[in-house]
Design a protein with these regions (language model features):
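Terminus-proximal functional modules
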Residues: 1-73, 77-95
Length: 95
C-alpha cells in the first residue's frame, strides 16, 4: 500500500487498525518474518494517537493467512494510520 512496505487494515467499525510489516533485522535470514501491530482509534474523530494494544512477530506465511482471514471478515485495506516508533506516534484518520 505504500513505499515503506507496511500494509494496513481497518475494521468495519473504523475503530481497530492493524499494521503488517516485514522484520528486516531478524537473525535467521532463511525465514521471513513480519511484525503485526494492533491498535484502536482514539478520540471521536481520530484526533488523538491510536492506542497500541499488541505487537507480535510471525512467519510471513502466518501473516498472509491472517491478512486474508481479516479481509474475509470485513476488514478493509487502508492507508498508514500512525508513524514513528511506539512511544511517539501520530494518527491520521482522514487517510
Amino acid at each position: 500500500m505504500n513505499s515503506t512496505n507496511d500494509f494496513w487494515l481497518i475494521d468495519s467499525n473504523f475503530v481497530g487498525v492493524i499494521r503488517f510489516y516485514k522484520d528486516k533485522d531478524h537473525s535467521d535470514k532463511s525465514i521471513d518474518y513480519m511484525f503485526i501491530e494492533e491498535g484502536i482509534i482514539m478520540g471521536i474523530h481520530g484526533e488523538n494517537p491510536p492506542l497500541m494494544k499488541t505487537r507480535k512477530k510471525v512467519v510471513i506465511e502466518e501473516a498472509r493467512l491472517l491478512w486474508q482471514k481479516l479481509l474475509n471478515e470485513g476488514w478493509q485495506k487502508t492507508n498508514k494510520k500512525w508513524w514513528g516508533n511506539s512511544t511517539k506516534t501520530f494518527f491520521n484518520f482522514r487517510n
